[in-house]
C-alpha cells in the first residue's frame, strides 16, 4: 500500500511538470523581445543634436514599425514614447545579443530601397513622408534601445515679406523638379513651407521653388548653383518676398524643426 502511494505521487509529479513545460513561454528564458525606439544624432557643421521630427512618436496615424531579426520581419507597434511591442514578438531564447534592422512605415514588411514622398504635404502627407530606418544594429539583452534615423531631407522655410498681408497663412509654396515623388515631380509644402524630400542633388539652372501670393501672383526661383540634399539633413530656405519678386538663400540647420506643421 505504501509502495502504491509512492508510485502515485511520482506519476502526479511528472504530470504537473509536463503541464508546466507546455505552458512555458517560447525561448530558453522565455523573454520577449521589446525595444525602445530613439533617434540618432545629426551632424551638421560640427553640431551634435538630436534628429527628430517632433521629439517623440506622437501624432502618427500608422503606428506599425517593421523589425527584422535573422531575416524574419515582424510588425511591432510603437507608442508615443517609442516603446515597441508586438502581438507576435521575437524571443531572446539563448541569445544575449541580437542584430536588428528596422524601418518605418511598415509597408507590408518590405523596406523601400529608395523612399517615395507624398506630393501634397500640406496635410497628413507631411508625416506620411517621414521614412525612418535602423541599419544592422547590435542590441544587447541588457539595453534594448534601437536608434532610428531619417531617410529624407527636411526643408524648412523662413518667410519675410515687405508686402502687406503676405504671411504663411495665405501663400502657397511648392518645391519643383524633384525625384521620387509619389505623383509627379512637385511637392506642395506645409502651411509653414516645410517639406520632406528624398536625398538628391538638383543642378544649377533648375526651377526649384514656386511661390503663389494671395493676389495670385506666382514667382519661380531658379537655382544659381547645385543644391545637394543629404539624408537626415535639415536645410533652411530663407524666402524674401517683395514687390520685385522673391529672393532665396539656403543655409544648413543644426536640427530638424520639431513643430507640428
Describe each model-derived feature in a short phrase.
Residues 2-6, 18-261:
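Sec-type signal peptide cleavage vicinity
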Residues 9-15:
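Bacterial N-terminal signal peptides
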Amino acid at each position: 500500500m505504501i509502495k502504491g502511494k509512492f508510485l502515485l505521487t511520482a506519476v502526479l509529479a511528472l504530470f504537473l511538470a509536463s503541464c508546466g513545460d507546455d505552458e512555458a513561454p517560447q525561448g530558453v528564458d522565455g523573454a520577449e523581445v521589446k525595444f525602445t525606439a530613439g533617434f540618432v544624432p545629426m551632424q551638421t557643421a560640427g553640431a551634435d543634436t538630436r534628429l527628430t521630427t517632433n521629439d517623440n512618436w506622437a501624432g502618427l496615424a500608422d503606428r506599425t514599425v517593421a523589425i527584422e531579426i535573422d531575416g524574419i520581419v515582424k510588425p511591432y507597434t510603437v507608442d508615443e514614447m517609442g516603446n515597441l511591442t508586438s502581438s507576435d514578438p521575437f524571443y531572446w531564447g539563448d541569445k544575449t545579443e541580437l542584430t536588428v534592422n528596422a524601418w518605418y512605415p511598415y509597408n507590408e514588411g518590405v523596406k523601400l530601397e529608395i523612399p517615395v514622398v507624398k506630393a501634397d504635404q500640406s496635410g497628413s502627407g507631411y508625416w506620411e513622408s517621414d521614412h525612418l530606418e535602423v541599419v544592422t544594429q547590435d542590441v544587447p539583452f541588457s539595453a534594448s534601445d534601437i536608434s532610428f534615423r531619417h531617410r529624407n531631407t527636411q526643408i524648412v522655410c523662413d518667410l519675410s515679406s515687405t508686402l502687406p498681408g503676405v504671411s504663411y497663412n495665405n501663400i502657397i509654396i511648392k518645391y519643383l523638379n524633384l525625384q521620387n515623388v509619389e505623383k509627379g515631380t512637385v511637392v506642395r509644402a506645409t502651411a509653414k513651407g516645410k517639406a520632406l524630400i528624398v536625398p538628391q542633388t538638383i543642378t544649377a539652372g533648375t526651377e526649384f521653388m514656386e511661390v503663389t501670393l494671395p493676389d495670385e501672383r506666382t514667382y519661380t526661383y531658379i537655382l544659381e548653383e547645385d543644391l545637394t540634399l543629404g539624408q537626415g539633413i535639415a536645410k533652411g530656405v530663407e524666402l524674401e518676398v517683395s514687390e520685385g519678386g522673391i529672393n532665396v538663400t539656403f543655409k544648413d540647420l543644426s536640427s530638424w524643426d520639431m513643430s507640428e506643421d
